[in-house]
């Protein structure tokens, strides 16, 4: 998703000052090579392992995190951003409202953000298509009996993180064990998993 996100920033007059990645095939390249778009930007992709050491020198106002879907997978990057006073927004689905799925980690990150006078938030497809759009339609209805939805998109456009949490490539048995079964728990078990930070939100 960073390919598109970087383009959006540039198209809207934003300035990209740093880029980080885990993919060794991208590290050391100018972001223009990653985007396959536009002129050279003189922003070289750095190893994510160097982020804690180099982010401060970038003087970034905000970080856009387009890597993973689950809050626990984003903890390190959010923490680095917070400790450097950098605001952060992610397209990671759980971060849209993680207080009910991973309250302990959400509280921890909230305190880091407040201590360094910055903001962490989640927004993206789920914000518009699963939230705001539905609420707007409901507001025009005289009465509502039930709401059903279906969502489809090309996983190839969203990277490995999204493909993984959707179970792409798994056989039926593996899909049932790793993806489907996590929602087949009672409320007490779900609460236990949430408190332990091990709950996989159903929107995955």
Predicted regions and their residues:
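Residue-level detector of anion-binding/catalytic polar loops
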Residues: 15, 87, 119
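Short, ordered loop/turn segments at secondary-structure junctions
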Residues: 22, 68, 92-96, 125-126, ...
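Short, hinge-like loop/turn segments at secondary-structure boundaries
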Residues: 33-38, 107-109, 138-140, 165-167
């Amino acid at each position: 998703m960073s390919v598109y996100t970087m383009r959006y920033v540039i198209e809207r007059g934003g300035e990209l000052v740093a880029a980080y990645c885990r993919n060794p095939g991208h590290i050391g390249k100018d972001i223009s090579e990653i985007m396959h778009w536009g002129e050279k930007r003189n922003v070289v992709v750095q190893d994510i392992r160097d982020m804690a050491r180099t982010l401060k020198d970038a003087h970034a106002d905000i970080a856009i995190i387009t890597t993973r879907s689950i809050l626990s997978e984003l903890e390190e990057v959010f923490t680095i951003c917070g400790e450097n006073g950098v605001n952060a927004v992610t397209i990671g689905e759980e971060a849209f409202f993680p207080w009910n799925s991973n309250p302990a980690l959400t509280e921890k990150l909230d305190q880091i953000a407040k201590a360094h006078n910055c903001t962490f938030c989640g927004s993206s497809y789920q914000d518009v298509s699963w939230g705001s759009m539905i609420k707007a339609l409901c507001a025009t209805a005289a009465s509502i009996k039930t709401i059903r939805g279906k969502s489809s998109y090309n996983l190839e456009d969203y990277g490995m993180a999204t493909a993984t949490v959707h179970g792409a490539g798994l056989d039926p048995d593996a899909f049932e064990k790793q993806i489907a079964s996590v929602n087949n728990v009672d409320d007490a078990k779900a609460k236990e998993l949430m408190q332990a930070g091990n709950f996989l939100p159903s929107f995955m």
